[in-house]
Amino acid sequence: MRVQRVQIMGAGALGSLVGALIQLAGYDVIFVARGKQLEALKKGLRVSGLKNAELKVYCTSQPEDADITFVTVKAYDTETVAKKLAEVDAGVVCSLQNGVGNEEILAKYCRKVLGGVTTYGANLKDYGHVVYAGEGYTYVGEMDGRVSGEAEMVAEVLRDAGMRAEAVNDIEFRIWAKAVVNAAINPITAICRVKNGEVVRNPHLWEVARAVADEGRQVMARMGYEFDAASEVRKVAEMTAENRSSMLQDLERGKRTEVEFINGAIVKKGEEFGIDCAVNRTLLNLVRGVESGL
């Protein structure tokens, strides 16, 4: 199948970057956005940072038919957008979201769903202006571990766009591994209002992060996955030392976070296995407390 139309469902920071790179590679891209971002995109999309470009883009508030649809909305909006995608032929739907459970929600409404994980860095400097902040890797795959033509097709489009992308047979492991790392970094940085590097530099914060990671490791072990969570948390925090986590940015902007789909998912899975994820639950409740005061 020849891919021509690619849709970005949720053209925020990451969605705008991915969409821009794909459009620059010659594909027709539909940017689905809302509010001030939609109004700004009607005037054009600016990319700065590792790549500089000014693009005229096709943007809309509702999804349309496409060959591939990348879902890049916040996890708490997944169900809402999944219902909208069910009303069109969205093609192969690939989540590039944070947290656990997005793919299962999408699969209730969409014909073909792939899981995805990306470490590319994007920040919205202003509405209609995305900063390409960091190169990374993007992995896509079937949730049941099969290697499929659809996953390879999606990876090929991303590679055409100049991204490092690979179709893999262990996407569920990668989604959980990213969630465990996020669980140890994001809430701590959000509550303490610090950059990622402080999680390893400050011994008090590192003690909490290591405990969160160990609970995640135990849960993943019961799922059949071996993951050295604490080492990975340290590595990611050091590599992104100057970054402000998305959860910190959300709280600073008075917005809801994705904590329910990160620490909340670990707590929930732990309960299934009889593992008490007390530190994850504490961070979950602290972030909930901050959110409720917004």
UniProtKB/Swiss-Prot annotation:
One of its GO terms (molecular function) is NADP binding. One of its GO terms (cellular component) is cytoplasm. It catalyses: (R)-pantoate + NAD(+) = 2-dehydropantoate + NADH + H(+); (R)-pantoate + NADP(+) = 2-dehydropantoate + NADPH + H(+). The active site is at K178. GO terms for biological process: coenzyme A biosynthetic process; pantothenate biosynthetic process. Its EC number is 1.1.1.169. The keyword Oxidoreductase applies. Its main location: cytoplasm. Keywords: Coenzyme A biosynthesis, Cytoplasm, NAD, NADP, Oxidoreductase. InterPro entries: 6-PGluconate_DH-like_C_sf, 6PGD_dom2, ApbA, Ketopantoate_reductase, KPA_reductase, KPR_N, NAD(P)-bd_dom_sf. NADP(+) binds at G10, A11, G12, A13, L14, G15, R34, K74, N98, A122, E258. It holds the Pfam family ApbA. Pathway: Cofactor biosynthesis; coenzyme A biosynthesis. It is found in: Cytoplasm. Substrate binds at K178, N182, N186, N196, N243, R244, S245, S246. Gene3D superfamilies: N-(1-d-carboxylethyl)-l-norvaline Dehydrogenase, domain 2, NAD(P)-binding Rossmann-like Domain. PANTHER family: 2-DEHYDROPANTOATE 2-REDUCTASE, 2-DEHYDROPANTOATE 2-REDUCTASE-RELATED. Catalyzes the NAD(P)H-dependent reduction of ketopantoate into pantoic acid. Belongs to the ketopantoate reductase family. This is 2-dehydropantoate 2-reductase.
